[in-house]
Amino acid sequence: MPQTVLNDMEDRMNKAINALKRDLSSLRAGRANPAMLDRVTVDYYGTPTPISQLANISVPEPRMLTIQPWDKTALKEIDRALQQSDLGISPSNDGVIIRLIIPPLTEERRKELVKLAGKGGEEAKVAIRNIRRDANDEIKKLEKAATISEDDSRRHQETIQKTTDKFIAEVDKIVKDKEKDILEV
């Protein structure tokens, strides 16, 4: 029974790490990356649809993304969604393909992005700590129900803490790497 609690905790912590990686991948670091368009949705026939499901996204140059819709009628909708997004990039539409030229980041914008990365890391740490609390509560319930001994309970709580520390260190490393990537000129 306690092993299920530990396995569940580790699965949930892995999901928190994956969510952080997904969120940080959409922060642009001055280079073209198709993942930066993941959060942009297009109103396609009344349904919010990710751009990646409507078009081929490629990186022909380090600072340029091209978006080639499979359905040419979606071109205007994709253009509108890009203009309304928080990317801060103006799309160039030639009627067949949309080009996004990624401008170099200003020092001010880099600092903003570093803060956003740090904030995302903090949110992931809070999520991991909440998962730790839930796991500790489950172990304490098992101890109260006399399913496990007090010694086993302490041992499991120590394991939970070690696992939490490992995941917190991983969050710190991910955020540090992203900050380094953002600050790289």
Swiss-Prot record:
The keyword Glycoprotein does not apply. Its main location: cytoplasm. Gene3D superfamilies: 3.30.1360.40, Ribosome-recycling factor. Pfam families: RRF. Keywords: Cytoplasm, Protein biosynthesis. GO terms for molecular function: ribosomal large subunit binding. It is found in: Cytoplasm. One of its GO terms (biological process) is translational termination. It comes from the Bacteria. One of its GO terms (cellular component) is cytoplasm. The keyword Protein biosynthesis applies. HAMAP family: RRF. Belongs to the RRF family. Responsible for the release of ribosomes from messenger RNA at the termination of protein biosynthesis. May increase the efficiency of translation by recycling ribosomes from one round of translation to another. This is Ribosome-recycling factor. It comes from Brevibacillus brevis (strain 47 / JCM 6285 / NBRC 100599).
